[in-house]
């Protein structure tokens, strides 16, 4: 767990990095995912994320009633990589709702939205009977070395999922909620 001292240490580290970047005449906006994520967040008035795919295209994800921004981003990315139409539901909302009920009613979570690991498990279950979900699942290795930026700091579980996928991740130094611990 992180304490208040860790927050101050992190702020000092951020300041040092910002200073080094200024001296090197580089900015975060040089990563194409940064302005894309921030623009999506401004458009949606909520958390958003962007990924640069191997072909250089940018996909975004936003927070919804069902999914966190990072989970939506992963689904949009694998759809794009698998040439699956954007409007296609890889996971039925009726499949997501029981997972949300489990999280909130039985596991005590305050956040009903699916995280990245949960959405990937749901996708793998759907892949057993849905060809598009199977195609999407097969795209996951293509995410290795892709770059992601999020408009808010992520939960530990989302950070770990991106790391396991081999995705480079940065985020704005902003918490989604006014809480010290995510």
Predicted regions and their residues:
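Short, small-residue-biased leader/transition segments that mark boundaries at the very start
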Residues: 3-8
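Cyclic nucleotide-binding regulatory module and flanking cytosolic helices
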Residues: 9-16
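C-terminal binding/interaction regions
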Residues: 11, 21, 36, 96-182
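Conserved mixed alpha/beta catalytic, RNA-binding, or beta-rich assembly cores of soluble enzyme
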Residues: 17-117, 127-130
């Amino acid at each position: 767990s992180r304490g208040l001292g860790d927050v101050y240490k992190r702020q000092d580290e951020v300041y040092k990095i910002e200073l080094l970047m200024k001296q090197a005449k580089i900015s975060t906006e040089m990563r194409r995912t940064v302005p894309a994520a921030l623009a999506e967040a401004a458009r949606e008035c909520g958390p958003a994320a962007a990924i640069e795919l191997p072909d250089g295209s940018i996909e975004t994800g936003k927070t919804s009633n069902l999914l966190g921004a990072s989970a939506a981003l992963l689904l949009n990315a694998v759809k794009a990589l698998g040439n699956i139409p954007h409007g296609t539901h890889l996971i039925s909302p009726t499949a997501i709702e029981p997972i949300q009920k489990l999280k909130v009613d039985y596991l005590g979570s305050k956040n009903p939205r699916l995280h990245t690991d949960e959405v990937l498990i749901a996708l793998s279950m759907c892949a057993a009977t849905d060809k598009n979900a199977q195609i999407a699942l097969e795209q996951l290795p293509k995410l290795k070395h892709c770059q992601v930026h999020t408009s808010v700091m992520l939960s530990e579980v989302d950070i770990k999922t991106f790391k396991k996928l081999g995705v480079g991740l940065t985020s704005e130094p902003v918490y989604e909620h006014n809480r010290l611990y995510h």
